[in-house]
């Protein structure tokens, strides 16, 4: 893996989004394993140990995949080819912004200011583009975020509803609009803080769930976002091969840990086309 030269966000939106992720994930992790879990299961019991280990397994995958996403260089910086050697029939084209030839399925990112190999999109939460080399880690990062927020939401239901006393209509307002405390009076209790984390996990579950459906459909259909928007489907090789194109030849193991090596079935400049019957 080639390391990116610059890993810090380039725009304010990227900076604040990435800062939010780097802040909220450790807070939720602490809340679930050191506040919620001991309140539901007795410390040292078998359910407590199993849930504690599972929570750390999820956290390891979230942090590991996030790290690989931001450090992995998936740009065309090392793929310079002389104009005479490139073939437009293979998908090579001239990028006016980079003033060089761009490989097939690569697109220029105005934020990263370079062409990205098999560019899917620019992710504001990681401050970089998702492309050929880090697509696998993005998919797994998204999957484990959804698992984590769903897992948190289910346990938070038991924790919040057993802990808080509800009074209509203020309790209803606090649940639906937790920031309304700044209008109706600041509530500095720990219950209000826990309630905000409960809302964050619920919103996170819905948000990552929608993203999982969208991006998993792209992977299964052999598409990236730009191609899907333009109705380009010539890279659809069947669901299994499409999955290998993103997760690698050992695709069935990539969900376990981000450190598992899984070689991609082709290089970064040549992609198989689906045979189209005339």
Question: At which residue positions do the language-model features occur?
Answer:
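Membrane-associated feature with strongest affinity for ZDHHC
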Residues: 1-278
């Amino acid at each position: 893996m080639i390391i990116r030269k610059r890993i810090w966000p380039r725009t304010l939106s990227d900076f604040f989004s990435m800062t939010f992720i780097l802040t909220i994930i450790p807070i939720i992790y602490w809340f679930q394993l050191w506040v919620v879990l001991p309140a539901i299961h007795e410390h040292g019991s078998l359910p407590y140990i199993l849930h504690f280990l599972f929570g750390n397994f999820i956290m390891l995958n979230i942090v590991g995949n996030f790290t690989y996403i931001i450090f992995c260089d998936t740009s065309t910086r090392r793929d310079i080819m002389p104009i005479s050697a490139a073939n437009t029939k293979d998908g090579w084209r001239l990028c006016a912004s980079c003033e060089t030839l761009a490989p097939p399925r690569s697109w220029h990112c105005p934020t990263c200011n370079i062409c990205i190999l098999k560019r899917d999109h620019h992710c504001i939460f990681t401050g970089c583009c998702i492309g050929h080399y880090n697509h696998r880690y993005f998919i797994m990062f998204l999957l484990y975020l959804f698992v984590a927020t769903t897992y948190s939401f289910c346990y938070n239901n038991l924790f919040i509803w057993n802990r808080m006393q509800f009074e209509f209509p203020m309790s209803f307002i606090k649940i639906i609009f937790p920031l309304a405390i700044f209008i109706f009076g600041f509530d500095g209790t720990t219950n209000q803080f826990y309630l905000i984390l409960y809302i964050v996990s619920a919103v996170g579950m819905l948000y990552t769930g929608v993203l999982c459906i969208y991006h998993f459909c792209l992977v299964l259909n052999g598409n990236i976002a730009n191609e899907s928007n333009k109705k380009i489907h010539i890279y659809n090789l069947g669901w299994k091969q499409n999955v290998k194109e993103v997760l690698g030849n050992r695709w069935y193991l990539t969900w376990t840990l981000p450190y598992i090596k899984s070689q991609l079935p082709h290089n970064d400049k040549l992609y198989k086309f689906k045979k189209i019957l005339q």
